[in-house]
Design a protein with these regions (language model features):
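Cysteine-poor, low-complexity segments in flexible/peripheral regions
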Residues: 141-197
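Amphipathic alpha-helical polymerization modules
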Residues: 1-139, 186-289
């Protein structure tokens, strides 16, 4: 049986072949140029919607990173101040030991009092110190900040947690730590009067200094624990971020090797179709169309 094709059918077939090859070549060229596998959600609804979810996850990851950096900086500032305050508390405790020497006279006690007062003034300044942005290092209140999924930590060190109750950032002289040190200063002043009378016994003064020292060091340790949590969260979120980026790339980004091969194939077909159509145009078969 002989199959016959009309001239119009041959012409339309040639035109359609060129259009198909051109469309495919342009599509692959767009993917190579943009680096994106899909231009519209309709190209692959699942992949694009999954990509949107990945974008959301990456945005959350960026939020976690910002929170981690903020918390790490806040606690680093607090720890620097508390390290110094702990050293000053140790100096006060050494002064207390010196004050128990039986060889001291009233002038010696007055000299120790001056040293203790100077330390207290320096500590008060550190209690109310501000960071580089002008915010108090030890705030009257702190927030809970999420550093990774389902993990919340204190944004910083609370003023009363470090220095005891009774005072605020505006009234540091009312905190337990300040009052305990002030009692030591008063004790030294009274010893310098050589009356034999003191408002507080040495045991009471020592107990107050030790209580404030213990509270400060415990707060410093807790802050260090938060810093370790942040470090662990950074490590975990960094690995998760790499996984998200890889997944998104595999899902949405153009596979350049495959796309280049497909583009080359489509371009070859287009060139062949154009050449064939050119020969058909020159043929007598279409001279009367």
């Amino acid at each position: 049986m002989t199959v016959r094709f009309s001239s119009n059918q041959v012409l339309e077939s040639g035109v359609q072949g060129m259009e198909n090859a051109l469309s495919e070549a342009m599509s692959w060229n767009q993917k190579i140029t943009s680096g994106k596998q899909y231009d519209r959600a309709s190209d692959n609804a699942y992949a694009v919607s999954r990509g949107v979810r990945l974008d959301f996850d990456i945005s959350r990851l960026d939020m976690f990173k910002a929170n981690q950096n903020f918390v790490a900086s806040s606690h680093a500032n607090s720890q620097t101040q508390m390290d110094s305050l702990v050293n000053e508390m140790n100096s006060l405790k050494q002064l207390l030991v010196q004050s128990q020497s039986g060889a001291l006279n009233p002038s010696n006690f007055k000299a120790l009092k001056v040293q203790a007062e100077q330390i207290l003034i320096a500590m008060k300044q550190q209690m109310t110190a501000k960071d580089g942005t002008g915010n108090p290092i030890f705030g009257d209140a702190v927030n809970q900040v999420q550093i990774e999924p389902n993990v919340m930590v204190d944004s910083g060190v609370k003023f009363n947690d470090a220095f005891g109750t009774g005072g605020t950032l505006r009234t540091p002289e009312n905190t337990q730590m300040y009052l305990n040190i002030q009692k030591f200063v008063t004790y030294l002043n009274e010893k310098g009067q050589n009356t034999g009378l003191t408002t507080q016994t040495v045991d009471q003064v020592s107990a107050g200094l030790n209580a404030s020292f213990d509270q400060l060091t415990m707060t410093l340790q807790r802050s260090g624990g938060v810093a370790n949590q942040v470090d662990n969260a950074k490590t975990a979120m960094s690995a998760f971020g790499v996984q998200l980026a890889d997944t998104q790339s595999v899902l949405l980004d153009t596979d350049m090797a495959a796309a280049t091969a497909s583009y080359t194939r489509a371009q070859t077909l287009l060139n062949a179709a154009q050449a064939m159509f050119a020969r058909l145009q020159q043929s007598n078969l279409f001279s009367k169309l």
